[in-house]
């Protein structure tokens, strides 16, 4: 199908295996993840009043995936809509839900990242088809009265300087978009026509794909690498500054699982211990918006996340988009 080898893929990406859905869709995967998250959180579907589905691979235009998930799981009281920020989607959705909770517009939110990217890759294109997998992950977040605790900084200043931060939840964030880089990573939709259109509209936007593979994911891998290794550390440092914390204060960095080399480079640029950057891409590949929640679930089930841990979530994707948030588990 494509000229490559297991050794070539592992050496350049760190990916050893991925999963391709057969019969499942973005919605069925999202609904399954949602049910498991609700069970783990001890919540009934009727208690959820906000559902956000982050995806860039929906199987239909209308209705949105979130509304279909709402119907599937019986969350009759939930406002539901989708968020498309590609691989940054889960972070953008999580911060959107956080805003709803802080404003008192919701009490319990369900955030899902779900992708079936196997249908969007050209299986003869070695630069993209080796990367992406299918899957979904979900989290439940709830509004609560923020407890506070003292956090000491430094050594000599520990007795005189302290900062009050919430005992749980998001402490700081940084979210950015750069539409000028849209052509770096893109996937065109099927052309839509009307009976009144005499000819197909010419593509004049340089950010729009214009070749025979326009309906598949197209990526400038080198440019994506340069963007990620430069901007992800900057975004993390910005979020840490917003939280009043430093790299050394963080127990774990949960990054979008795109490429092992990118994660290595981010850790190096932050001067952080590589052991604090867990990965699962060797088993699942790049799950786009699902990568962070799937990894969080694995870490939680493995007992590697503990109440009170300070963690950083960070991701980047098409748009170009990038985001990071600091939170207490």
Regions found by a protein language model. Name each.
Residues 1-23, 125-230, 234, 316, ...:
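Condensing-enzyme catalytic core mediating Claisen C-C bond formation in acyl metabolism
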Residues 62-64, 121-125, 322-326:
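Short acidic, glycine/serine/threonine-rich loops at helix termini
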Residues 2-8, 60-74, 111-117, 198-209, ...:
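Acidic-glycine-rich active-site phosphate/pyrophosphate-binding loop
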Residues 46-54, 248-256:
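Short glycine-rich phosphate-binding loop at a beta-alpha junction
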Residues 27, 31-34, 38, 57-58, ...:
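Claisen-condensing/thiolase-fold acyl-transfer catalytic domains that form or cleave C-C bonds
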Residues 100-136:
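Flexible, glycine-rich active-site loops centered on histidine and acidic residues
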Residues 54, 84, 109-115, 141, ...:
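Short beta-strand segments
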């Amino acid at each position: 199908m494509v000229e490559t080898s297991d050794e070539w893929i592992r050496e350049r990406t760190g990916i050893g295996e991925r999963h391709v859905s057969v019969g499942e869709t973005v919605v069925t995967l999202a609904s399954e993840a949602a049910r498991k998250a609700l069970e783990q959180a001890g919540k009934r579907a009727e208690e959820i009043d906000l559902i956000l589905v982050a995806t860039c691979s929906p199987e239909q235009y209308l209705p949105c995936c979130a509304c279909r998930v709402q119907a599937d799981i019986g969350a009759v009281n939930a406002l539901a809509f989708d968020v498309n920020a590609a691989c940054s989607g889960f972070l953008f959705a999580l911060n959107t839900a956080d805003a709803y909770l802080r404003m008192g517009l919701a009490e319990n939110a369900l955030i899902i990242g779900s992708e079936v990217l196997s249908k969007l890759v050209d299986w003869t294109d070695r630069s993209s088809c080796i990367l992406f997998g299918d899957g979904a992950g979900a989290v439940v977040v709830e509004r609560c009265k923020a407890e506070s605790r003292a956090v000491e900084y430094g050594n000599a200043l520990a007795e005189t300087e302290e900062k009050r931060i919430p005992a749980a939840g998001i402490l700081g964030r940084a979210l950015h978009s750069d539409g000028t880089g849209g052509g770096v990573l893109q996937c065109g939709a099927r052309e839509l026509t009307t009976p009144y259109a005499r000819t197909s509209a010419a593509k004049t936007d340089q950010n729009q794909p214009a070749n025979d593979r326009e309906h598949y994911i197209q990526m400038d891998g080198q440019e994506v690498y340069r963007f990620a290794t430069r901007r992800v550390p900057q975004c993390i440092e910005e979020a840490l500054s917003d939280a009043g914390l430093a790299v050394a204060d963080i127990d774990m960095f949960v990054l979008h699982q795109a490429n092992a080399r990118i994660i290595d480079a981010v850790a190096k640029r932050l001067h952080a211990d590589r052991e604090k950057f867990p990965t699962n891409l060797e088993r699942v590949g790049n799950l786009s918006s699902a990568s962070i929640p799937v990894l969080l679930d694995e870490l939680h089930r493995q007992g590697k996340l503990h109440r009170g841990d300070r963690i950083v979530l960070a991701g980047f994707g098409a748009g170009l988009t990038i985001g990071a948030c600091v939170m207490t588990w």
